[in-house]
Amino acid sequence: MKKYFFPLAIVACTALLNTSCSSSSTEPPVPQEYEGDLPKPTYSEQAVSFEIASDNVKDKSGKASLKAINFTESGKAIFEVKTTAGTKFVTYGATIDGDIYIVTDANGREIGRLRKLTSRAADDVTIEGTITVTINGVEYTFTISTKATSTSVPPTAVSRNTNNLARTWQVASMNVVLSGDIDLSKLVVGGNLKEFADAAQEAGANLNAEEMKALSKVVNSMTFNKNGLLSIEYSDASSDGCNWLWASGEKQEYIRLLQRNGAEFGNKFLSDRSVVKVDFTPTSVALTMKTDIRGSKNYSATLTVVLK
């Protein structure tokens, strides 16, 4: 069945900290409240999600199933794949031409395309095509010919803040303040999480090997869509996926982060109970979150990520 997803029904979100870092300790500029409309992304009218209820779309090995494809407002294709290691996400570039969806890698090379077929009688959507995606160095080739639930959100059906947030953002900076048993204030430029992890470790955070590994990535971008999905895209071509939800009332100042289909997300400084403050400017958005850390050291972490 094809359905239209409206603001009250938007689903929920995960994994956000995976953002940026650099060196100065100068406080970042605080965005002023902005209540205007940001320019519409290229595919704000054509963005769509295809969800596959069954596990019948498997890769050639039979070990992975394609569960969903989200074609976003900014021209991204976010794939949700069920593997033997759990639910994984990977993000590519996309071009939408009517009912044809072309997927490209970081070099602009086509890695597959889909065609959408709609039955007037039953209002069913069928997607067909062949696509090869790579997750953690493993290639999965899916030959697709299946019914799917098609979900689209017309820009007129959602709030201004949802339209403003739903796009791909580049990480500009991250400012972190640790207070309590650990005292640290660090502004980082770009998406290198390791800079932040190293600074926290030097300040006595006692991060273990697993926690340091989770903070070893470089974030290139973040993609929000109007269906409530967030993708965090790393420099190694991997992605994390989660759902997002407005946590406040009509003013929509906060989003809540929640897990999506059992996919792992977050790290030492982010939990699935995180609530994120959202502040827009005419050219950027600042996301601010606070996490209480309890363990061998007890402290609070306040993180402000600026996306442009």
Locate predicted features:
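Short, solvent-exposed loop/hinge segments that bridge or flank secondary-structure elements
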Residues: S49-S74, V171-N227, L257, N261
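Contiguous, well-ordered beta-strand patches that form the walls/edges
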Residues: T72-T126, N206-I293, Y299
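Short, low-complexity, Pro/Ser/Thr/Gly-rich segments in the mature regions of secreted, periplasmic
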Residues: Y299-K308
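Acidic/polar, low-complexity intrinsically disordered N-terminal segments immediately downstream
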Residues: Y4, S22-V176, K308
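Bacterial N-terminal signal peptides that target proteins for export
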Residues: M1-L8
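C-terminal motif of bacterial Sec signal peptides marking the signal peptidase cleavage site
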Residues: L17-S20
